[in-house]
Amino acid sequence: MANKNAYAQSGVDVEAGYEVVERIKKHVARTERAGVMGALGGFGGMFDLSKTGVKEPVLISGTDGVGTKLMLAIKYDKHDTIGQDCVAMCVNDIIAAGAEPLYFLDYVATGKNEPAKLEQVVAGVAEGCVQAGAALIGGETAEMPGMYGEDDYDLAGFAVGVAEKSQIIDGSKVVEGDVLLGLASSGIHSNGYSLVRRVFADYTGEEVLPELEGKKLKEVLLEPTRIYVKAVLPLIKEELVNGIAHITGGGFIENVPRMFADDLAAEIDESKVPVLPIFKTLEKYGQIKHEEMFEIFNMGVGLMLAVSPENVERVKELLDEAVYEIGRIVKKENESVIIK
């Protein structure tokens, strides 16, 4: 007679996998939106594009993970916000192209299925989807003993959005004289964490550093990535934005030039950048060169908009938050980003 426990003996707990599915159903239900078809658990997630009302739809997709920020979530045993980070990294990328997020899929790979922990992860994904207006229509949880340690897991996601063909943001509308507006980040977001972990390798995370305004270090390091979708979508609908840059890995230097043509450059006034305390702390404790900080981190600006001068006031009115005029678009001479 075949051994019914053979799979379990190899390290895969099928029953725990079933429990994960049951636990996450209520979180997935929070994300439902018009267009979703079928129930959770099918072989593929379905979405009716006609429900969006877009006349000339162009699908825009993005995929990403959260890098080694996951290692801090595991170290500090805090798993309820890392899913929001994953969603943010994907949807902020596609909103930069003018897309309204429609749906999201996640992938979690782990050494051992721990239903309570994985529920926290997916709850964070669901919260991110709610903030982005995207439905969580599918995903995969893979138990991979031998590939990962029992406490380890990896997380990635995939977002699909839609844009009116006439409202796609591809850099072609950005011109000399456009004003650069910065939207505040919530913190480090989800890049640069290999360096962050090195700087704070000897810290427990419980420390309240004087530079961090009374917060524990671990709270600041795991602050979830801001999702900009609901703030920026109205600007796209009114065609008020010429270019958008999501400031992630590579900081200002790598990401800002992605929103304009090769013959243009961004001239940024550093004094106008709302640098958050964590970045000053990283620079100080890590002895990082000041100019290198702008090559790695968002420095307090998670999303940058290129806007025609005549539209600046309307953009500020719609955003209804602190908006930072940090620079302008100029003709390129040498560098693509000039920080003064």
From Swiss-Prot:
Record protein name field: Phosphoribosylformylglycinamidine cyclo-ligase
SUPFAM superfamilies cross-referenced by the UniProt entry: PurM C-terminal domain-like (SSF56042), PurM N-terminal domain-like (SSF55326)
Catalytic activity: 2-formamido-N(1)-(5-O-phospho-beta-D-ribosyl)acetamidine + ATP = 5-amino-1-(5-phospho-beta-D-ribosyl)imidazole + ADP + phosphate + H(+)
InterPro entries linked to this entry: PurM-like_C_dom, PurM-like_C_sf, PurM-like_N, PurM-like_N_sf, PurM_cligase
Principal EC category: ligase
Highest taxon in the source lineage: Bacteria
GO molecular function annotations of the record: ATP binding; phosphoribosylamine-glycine ligase activity; phosphoribosylformylglycinamidine cyclo-ligase activity
HAMAP family: AIRS (MF_00741)
Similarity field: Belongs to the AIR synthase family.
Keywords of this entry: ATP-binding, Cytoplasm, Ligase, Nucleotide-binding, Purine biosynthesis
Pathway as given in its UniProt record: Purine metabolism; IMP biosynthesis via de novo pathway; 5-amino-1-(5-phospho-D-ribosyl)imidazole from N(2)-formyl-N(1)-(5-phospho-D-ribosyl)glycinamide: step 2/2
One Gene Ontology CC term in the entry: cytosol
Localization: Cytoplasm
Membrane spanning stretches: none
Chief location bin: cytoplasm
Any GO BP annotation: 'de novo' IMP biosynthetic process
Documented EC number(s): 6.3.3.1
